[in-house]
């Protein structure tokens, strides 16, 4: 592949550097940066946040991180698992990580529940619903956060045919979407107060 997951991480950190360098011009507080992502963006955000606190992981990805720390994450319907024996994992890994990723230094990090990755994360608010086709990804990832005593919260909506994958992004005017955005904002405010 011409453009891999590692390139996406590099782009993310270039954007974060821009925010760090120029955010003050727009009255932003560059020491109070929070991140929200959905689906594949939630996965990218998770990995980039972990790389900020795990130099071994960043080196394995050959990524130069931006030191502006992400204070907390909002992860909506995260596509955390990319190498499972399912629709995502059957074809995606070689395109994301390269054809030889299993022999690379990054190989252990492909598992998002790898202890060194999980313990490098800032506080996380996870959002899913019973009708999210990746519901099991979020709940399994939440178990890893619990196992390693990482600060987090799970917002898991009940069965409702309107609350499909990343519903708060695709259907922003649903009451549950408003509730999701409000919950993320309140969680970030709590983290800021600590």
Question: What feature does the model see in each segment?
Answer:
Residues 1-194:
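Alpha/beta-hydrolase superfamily serine-hydrolase fold, recognizing
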């Amino acid at each position: 592949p011409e453009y891999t997951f590692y390139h996406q991480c590099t782009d993310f950190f270039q954007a974060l550097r821009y925010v760090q360098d120029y955010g003050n011009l727009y009255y932003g507080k560059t020491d109070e940066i929070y991140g929200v992502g959905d689906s594949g963006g939630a996965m990218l955000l998770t990995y980039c946040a972990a790389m900020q606190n795990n130099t071994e992981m960043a080196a394995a990805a050959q990524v130069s991180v931006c030191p502006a720390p992400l204070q907390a994450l909002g992860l909506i319907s995260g596509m955390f698992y990319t190498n499972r024996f399912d629709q995502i994992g059957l074809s995606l890994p070689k395109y994301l990580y390269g054809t030889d990723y299993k022999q690379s230094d990054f190989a252990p990090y492909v598992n998002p529940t790898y202890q060194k990755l999980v313990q490098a994360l800032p506080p996380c608010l996870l959002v899913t619903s019973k009708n999210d086709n990746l519901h099991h990804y979020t709940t399994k990832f939440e178990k890893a956060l619990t196992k390693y005593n990482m600060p987090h919260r799970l917002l898991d909506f009940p069965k409702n045919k309107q609350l499909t994958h990343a519903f708060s992004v695709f259907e922003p005017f649903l009451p549950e979407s408003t509730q999701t955005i409000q919950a993320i904002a309140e969680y970030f405010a709590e983290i800021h107060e600590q």
